[in-house]
């Protein structure tokens, strides 16, 4: 499968979303190359329950890119990356960002390595390990997590990776009042942003938590 086999509507949806998010349309080509690989591998390996390419654009690509403005440089660990979300879209749109995709599932990690190879993503590495077992303490300015765990669960398994004053960017649906209240000491909510994801209905929030 190649990019040309994707419908014009898929490309149009992505271009529209990038325009709304004020991101360069130059990212269309690598993002569609990633989407093509995801669709192909998903047939065999069931990497995501979403099958429709247009829905993938909205719920995977644009949803991930909605947080791009909040992290553009430094080192980032994407915990429980799954099929590379939000890590790969962020790496594509932020070439100066050094991204480590942390994924313990073997088939998903193999897919991620293939994406990195085929797209030539020199700013991306893959660690096939659980976050709590990653021996890179205090190495990252940022952590991302999308549908991984509660805020407390995320900082418990991955907090050691962050430098002092580093930030966790946790992607959530509804405003997570109870999760915020359960954060341990030395983790401070810096901001909660309501995300506007093009063509996506329903609530999306980004919780930015700073390590003190």
UniProtKB/Swiss-Prot annotation:
Keyword S-adenosyl-L-methionine attached: yes
A molecular-function term among this protein's GO annotations: rRNA (guanine-N7-)-methyltransferase activity
Ligand binding (S-adenosyl-L-methionine): 80, 85, 131-132, 146
Annotated keywords: Cytoplasm, Methyltransferase, rRNA processing, S-adenosyl-L-methionine, Transferase
Transferase found in the keyword field: yes
Principal subcellular localisation of the protein: cytoplasm
EC id: 2.1.1.170
Subcellular location: Cytoplasm
Reaction catalysis annotation: guanosine(527) in 16S rRNA + S-adenosyl-L-methionine = N(7)-methylguanosine(527) in 16S rRNA + S-adenosyl-L-homocysteine
InterPro entries (UniProt xref): rRNA_ssu_MeTfrase_G, SAM-dependent_MTases_sf
Enzyme category, top tier: transferase
NCBIfam families for this protein: rsmG_gidB
Function: Specifically methylates the N7 position of guanine in position 527 of 16S rRNA.
Family: Belongs to the methyltransferase superfamily. RNA methyltransferase RsmG family.
Name of this protein: Ribosomal RNA small subunit methyltransferase G
The organism of origin for this protein: Xylella fastidiosa (strain Temecula1 / ATCC 700964)
Lineage: Bacteria, Pseudomonadati, Pseudomonadota, Gammaproteobacteria, Lysobacterales
């Amino acid at each position: 499968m190649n990019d040309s086999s994707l419908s014009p509507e898929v490309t149009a949806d992505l271009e529209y979303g990038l325009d709304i998010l004020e991101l360069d349309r130059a990212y269309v080509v690598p993002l569609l190359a990633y989407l093509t690989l995801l669709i192909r591998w998903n047939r065999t390996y069931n990497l995501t329950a979403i099958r429709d390419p247009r829905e993938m654009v909205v719920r995977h690509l644009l949803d991930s890119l909605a947080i791009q403005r909040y992290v553009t440089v430094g080192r980032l660990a994407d915990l429980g990356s799954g099929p590379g979300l939000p890590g790969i879209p962020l790496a594509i749109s932020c070439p100066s960002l050094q991204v480590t995709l942390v994924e313990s599932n073997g088939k998903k990690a193999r897919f991620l390595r293939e994406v990195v190879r085929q797209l030539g993503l020199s700013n991306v590495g893959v660690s096939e390990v659980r976050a709590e077992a990653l021996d890179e303490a205090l190495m990252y300015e940022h952590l991302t997590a999308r549908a991984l765990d509660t805020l407390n669960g995320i900082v418990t398994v991955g907090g050691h990776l962050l430098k002092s004053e580093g930030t966790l960017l946790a992607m959530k649906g509804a405003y997570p009042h109870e999760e915020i209240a359960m954060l341990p000491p030395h983790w401070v909510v810096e901001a909660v942003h309501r995300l506007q994801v093009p063509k996506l209905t329903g609530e999306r929030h980004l919780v930015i938590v700073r390590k003190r």
